[in-house]
Design a protein with these regions (language model features):
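Helix-interface capping motifs at the ends of transmembrane segments in multi-pass membrane proteins
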Residues: 1-4, 128-130
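Small-residue-rich helix-interface/hinge motifs
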Residues: 3-85
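Hydrophobic alpha-helical transmembrane segments
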Residues: 5-9, 106-107, 118
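A broad, low-specificity signal for short, low-complexity segments enriched in glycine/proline
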Residues: 17-21, 100-105
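General alpha-helical segment detector with a strong preference for membrane-spanning helices
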Residues: 23-24, 116, 120
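A short acidic, glycine/proline-enriched capping/turn motif at secondary-structure boundaries
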Residues: 74-75, 113-116
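PDZ peptide-recognition modules
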Residues: 80-104, 111, 118-142
């Protein structure tokens, strides 16, 4: 049984990390504050803070993950913009996901699935390069 569970968990963790890192990379590129980068859900098992203030954590249930943006209160990143403008000062408002232009928010949201697509292409390329393609040599029957 462990012969299947451990590789499954490793595979899920890698896929989730690549997916969430896609969101994280473009969020940072566009100046969105990231407070949490989590692999898994539930209670935190292990974690650390980087120099930009992001909490990187590994959690108990490794069946997903999330990137939490600065100022987000709910999972849908929906907030009252007027309330956010009043709540945060000018420097903090520059880090808010919800106040970024639509094209930047779209890229950040799409970056996770696109990262997974690129991962799939890379895996197939490696399989094709190292395993090769099957062929049947021509045989002449008498």
């Amino acid at each position: 049984m462990l012969n299947f569970i451990i590789p499954f968990i490793i595979l899920i963790v890698v896929v989730v990390f690549i997916h969430e890192y896609g969101h994280y990379y473009f969020a940072k590129k566009y100046g969105v504050g990231v407070t949490d980068f989590s692999i898994g859900f539930g209670k935190e098992i292990f974690g650390w803070n980087d120099k930009s203030g992001t909490r990187w954590k590994i959690c108990l249930i490794p069946l997903g993950g999330y990137v939490k943006f600065f100022g987000d209160r709910n999972v849908f990143s929906q907030s009252d913009q007027e309330a956010l403008i009043k709540k945060y000062n000018e420097k903090e408002r520059e880090k808010l996901f919800i106040l970024k232009p639509l094209y930047q928010r779209s890229i950040i949201v799409a970056a996770g699935p696109i990262a997974n697509f690129i991962l799939a292409v890379v895996i197939f390329l490696f399989i094709y390069m190292f395993v090769g393609k099957d062929f049947t040599p021509a045989v002449i029957n008498e």
